[in-house]
Curated annotation (Swiss-Prot):
GO biological process terms held by the UniProt record: translation
Quaternary structure and partners: Part of the 50S ribosomal subunit.
Protein name: Large ribosomal subunit protein uL30
Any GO MF annotation of the entry: structural constituent of ribosome
Taxon lineage: Bacteria, Pseudomonadati, Pseudomonadota, Betaproteobacteria, Neisseriales
InterPro entries: Ribo_uL30_ferredoxin-like_sf (IPR036919), Ribosomal_uL30_bac-type (IPR005996), Ribosomal_uL30_ferredoxin-like (IPR016082)
C-alpha cells in the first residue's frame, strides 16, 4: 500500500447544523469528531467528497 498516494484530511469545523449530504461525505471519509485526522487514498471518489466539504476540512499531501 505504500506505492499508493494518500491524503491527510482533518475536520476543522463542526457538522452540527450542516445538511445531510455534507454529514454523509464526512462519514464516508471516516471523520466523526472535530480535529480528527484520517488518511485516505487519493481517488476521484475521495477527492469529490473532500471538494464537497472543503469549507469544513483541511487537506495535506
Amino acid at each position: 500500500m505504500s506505492d499508493k498516494k494518500t491524503v491527510k484530511v482533518t475536520l476543522v469545523k463542526s457538522l452540527i447544523g450542516r445538511i445531510e449530504s455534507h454529514r454523509a461525505c464526512a462519514r464516508g471519509l471516516g471523520l466523526k469528531k472535530l480535529n480528527q485526522t484520517v488518511e485516505v487514498l487519493d481517488t476521484p471518489e475521495n477527492r469529490g467528497m473532500i471538494n464537497k466539504i472543503s469549507f469544513l476540512v483541511k487537506c495535506e499531501g
